[in-house]
Structure formats: C-alpha cells, structure tokens
Amino acid sequence: KSTLCLALCRFIEPFAGDIAIDGVSILKVGLADLRDRITVVPQDPALFEHTLRFNLDPDGKASDAEIMELIHKAALTNLVQRDPLGLDAMVHVKGGNLSSGEKQLICICRAILRKKKIVVMDEATANIDVQTEKTIHDLIKTEFRSSTVLTVAHRLNT
C-alpha cells in the first residue's frame, strides 16, 4: 500500500505497469509539476521546529480567519487555546510538545489548506481518537470533494 503512494509521488519508479492521472502517465509529467498537484499526509507526521501557524500553512497563503476556522472544524481548538501565543506558539523538534493525534491533525489541516488535486493519506488518522476521527472523516469529505483522495489504512473504519 505504501509502495503505491511512493510510486504515485515518484519517490520510486514503477518497474511494471503505469500510473496515470487524467489519462496521462505520471512518467510523462515533470516531477515538479506532478508533486505540485499532490499533497501527502504521512503516517509519521512531518512537523517543523517553528510556529503552529507555519506548521499549518508553510506557504503562508491562508488568512488567520481561514486557519482558525479549520482548527475549529478539525477539533484542534484546545491546542491553540492552551498556549497564550495561540498560532504563534512554537512546535518543538518533531512536534515533541504535541500528542501523536495532534501531529496528525496538523498535517491533515495543512493538506486541506494546500488545496491540491490529489491527496495521499497514509494511515493519517491512526493516532486520532474515535470521536475526533469521525469529525475528521466528515471534514475530509467536505474539504476534498474536488480532489482525488488515496487512503491507506489498516482499520476498516478509517
């Protein structure tokens, strides 16, 4: 399953068969162009030693209002409220000051804010509690309605 995700992003080249997007082989699409169409939410969240705002929106394209609305929808309000710096609170190295579920939620929010055509979710909700997971699945259905979402999961309900 994860190999398919790696091949889709061209981190590895398929040795047989083909992967096509809109009928065009990914091997015929420039690597930068291909990766510009895709966002990945990995099983092991990739976070930066930087502010919460930067981790949510490293491109700096979203307004604070957009970020806060998404934080509310993604059940991350407590994370922002527990630090007086709010969105400017620092995330430690590898998100050491966050729970594994919070890390995954941040990466899901980042993917939503990026608004890419293809979303790869590799065990993206594995560390989120059942109640929040339902909220996130509803959010994913709404926010990615115009995207193709490839989900890799061990649990059937994810």
Question: Which positions does each model-derived feature cover?
Answer:
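ABC ATPase nucleotide-binding domain helical subdomain, centered on the C-loop/LSGGQ "ABC signature"
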Residues: A20, K28, R53-V93, H137-D138, ...
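ABC ATPase nucleotide-binding domain "signature" region
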Residues: T3, S99-S100, I106-A111, T135, ...
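Helix-to-loop junction immediately C-terminal to a conserved catalytic motif
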Residues: L8-C9
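Catalytic Walker B motif of ABC-type/P-loop ATPase nucleotide-binding domains
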Residues: V119-E123
